[in-house]
Amino acid sequence: MAPAVFTSDYWKKYFSNKKKPTVKNTSDIDLLHINRGRQPFDEGLSINEDSFFYRHNIHVPRIVYLIIVACGSFIITGGIEFAIAYGMYKKTETSVRLWRLPDTLSGDAAVTNFVQAIVTYWVESILVQGDLRSGLVKPIYFGWWPENFLLREVLRAKPRYHFKFIVFRWMEWLVFVGLRGLVWSVPLWFLFWPATVGILCAPGRHEGNDYYFNNYPAPQVFKLIFGGGEGFVLTPWIAFLHMYMYGHYLHVAKNQKSLPKTSDLEQQRGTSSSQPSENDANITALPKPEPKMYENSDLTPARTPVTPAPLEKPVNLAPEVVEPTNAAASPLQLNAPKLTDVDDSALAYDPTKVQDGEDRFVHNDVPLENAENPSRFVHSDAPIDMTHTTTVISEAQNLPSTLLPQDGNAVHHDTDAPSLSNVRKSVDSPRVPPSFSDDAVSSFSLVTAPSINNVGGSTAPSVNNQEREYDYDDTSSRSSTLTERPVVH
């Protein structure tokens, strides 16, 4: 089985930022450390805020880390450069010279400077970011970030990927990191190359305008020292840059919640007197909203409570009441006929004798149980616990749905009941007391149900404060109560 380094999953965590913790994705990084059971970035190393190391972000573990990185790079880079020089100069036929081609040490040092800077940036970018994610070293934050666009791009830790395919993303990353390594190779060249050329003039054999060296071991030792020296300086510098970039991104991520979340300029008007935010002096803090706007303000006129003017005449919202001629009648009595002149005990409903224009109340001795159509009576299996019920009946429609049988209200209406028009025509005027005029009666149509609180053997209910008896058989009285509901026109 191939080692893990040759698998694509091993390299995806370095070259792909998809579903992986990155420098800017601090939440995923913290979650990763929590899952591993370790403190991220080793925050517990320095807890004394007054110490020199804490105030200047200089921790001994960081210094030790940079020294280890520098020494390791010196050994590795120096060994690689020694091997390259051995293969280049050991078996050459001509002497190695300082300036002239083909075997020139000055040209070799210049090329080594640029190539080594690019390769070192590639390798250290992977290793240092891995150490920062694992918590091996803590990032550094100095509270300053460059405003120059070029410097901000050079200090960018991750590229802006434009492709999804992993191979293209590798290429983007290589170009991105290589350009930054090339940028840092320029100051490195001014630091190392002139001094190196001046030092090489001392051991060389001067002939004419050039200096000559043996094929071995002078060129190999020169490359070892030159490459190792550059690695000793450049590698910890690259590690420090990544620690600095990581610290800045982490600081921004921690303070994102305290920044204003709105960019509406209309809400920032009149905020010149407000203090700037502690995290960013360029962002103007929004004014704090008052708990109650315009309350107790001198600019706002006092609100005068509006009192409605008293009415000249009281408005009577009650239905129209027709006063009977009898002075002893109750003033609250509605325009319903008073059946006082008729023997109530002899009243029974005989549908066979009801015709158009005839009286529906007849005097006969037919018991209620022999009535063929008792649909004009309200059948209730239980006492109706109501004191007064008034329902308006319309001529154009049947009884409303509220009067149909409901749960807990045993009021039943038979669908075979006579039509309202026939019933209205069947009411005979002689049955109505002379105190009610035709105009007054026809203008108000009500159905009034009396209050029924007891069933069977109890006192008969009253209609319009008068006693009323009904014809019913013994069987129906034991099981239910039949109440006539007169229709008034």
From Swiss-Prot:
One of its GO terms (cellular component) is endoplasmic reticulum membrane. It is found in: Endoplasmic reticulum membrane. It comes from the Eukaryota. The chain crosses the membrane at residues 63-83, 182-202, 221-241. The keyword Lipid metabolism does not apply. It is a multi-pass membrane protein. The keyword Signal does not apply. Residues 260-312, 401-435, 450-489 are annotated as: Disordered. This is Uncharacterized protein C594.02c. It comes from Schizosaccharomyces pombe (strain 972 / ATCC 24843).
